[in-house]
Amino acid sequence: MNKKQKVILSLLQEIDEICRRNKIEYYLSPRLTLCAVEGHPFPQNPMFGVVLMKTADMERFRLAVDEDPREKRALESMKSHKWFSGFYLRYTNTDTLCLNLDNTRDYAFPGIGVNIFPLRTPVASVKAERRLSRDENAWTELCHINYADRNFRSRVNRTIMRLQCMITGRQGQAAHLYDRLVRACQQPGANKYILKRRKQTTIFPAEIFAESKRVTLEGAELQVPAKTAEYLTISYGKNYKDAKEPRYVTPIALVVSARVSYTQFWKESGNFEKYCKERMKNARKLARSRRHKDYFNECWDYVEFCGERLNLSVSYEKQKDYIKNLYKNEDYMTLERVFRPYFKMMQKSLQKNGLFAEDEEIFDIYVDVLEKTGKTVQRSKIGTLI
């Protein structure tokens, strides 16, 4: 194991010690559980240090650490840091460095750490679930504005969140949202738990976490769900034993060190705040240019599509008399062969909620041929748009 992996393992051991002392249940993430159970090597990715706790236990852990803080350790959450982007905790070794230069505000203590994600219960009502999900997504997008959705609803939700931040203060709003999530996501008697990550949501039956057991990971005794097979099957599928860790390459924007602390890095970087502002400004420009590129590509694809339609319509215009003659003689087998390119273009047009009907006579013949040859699926789709 390298020094960064050893730091993560030591943090996991400390979390285990705190949980055992305060009788708090926790579970290694599916990735770490797989490493422990199947003997796979410890992950290279410094962001793979993850444990799971039920929402109530996660809050108890936060309070326990706040009451008895440790030297060179920090526990961050939305309760303590106004730019913390999600509903989870991060237990950090402050004598190390793990900094994403594109998101320098994410953590107040950007060292190597272990993320503690909550196992949420479903919210009591659908209405409350929608409202809470809306506010949580708006907060996350506000923290990572360069990667936020640009649709109208997301913009409105972010605007409402900004107004709330102006009224209560950003830190007050973050803490208030955290408290709401803690209250809403620990309903008694739940039959399932939801693990919500930034890009993935996984649902586990409640019985998986009914009991726990001890396993050994790189010589350290840690805790996992007793039903490890079911736990890993839900996460990786039936062939979880064959799951391999993808080859890890440190991203260009990520600075990681187990020897240098983030405070030393800041000092040696000179005016770090100015550097961060410039980098964020450049990231914003890059995100904007990517959106423009995506829009341009979409427009160009549509231009090419319209060109294909036009060329095909000219081709069928030249065959119009031939098609009418085949239709008059009820030669539907030949017509089906003639209309194959027309069928493909109609499929593309229907995907864009449109019709390929440049010539009304040919279109009417085509629709009748669909009925006669039994292609009722496309015929019904056309019928809904006529």
Language-model regions, residue ranges each:
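Alpha-helical repeat scaffolds
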Residues: 299-303, 334-345, 376-386
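Active-site nucleotide-donor binding segment shared across nucleotidyl transfer reactions
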Residues: 16-49, 53-59, 207
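Conserved catalytic core of two-metal-ion nucleotidyltransferases
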Residues: 1-20, 62-134, 138-235, 242-281
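Alpha-helical junction/boundary sensor with strong preference for TPR arrays
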Residues: 306, 346-350
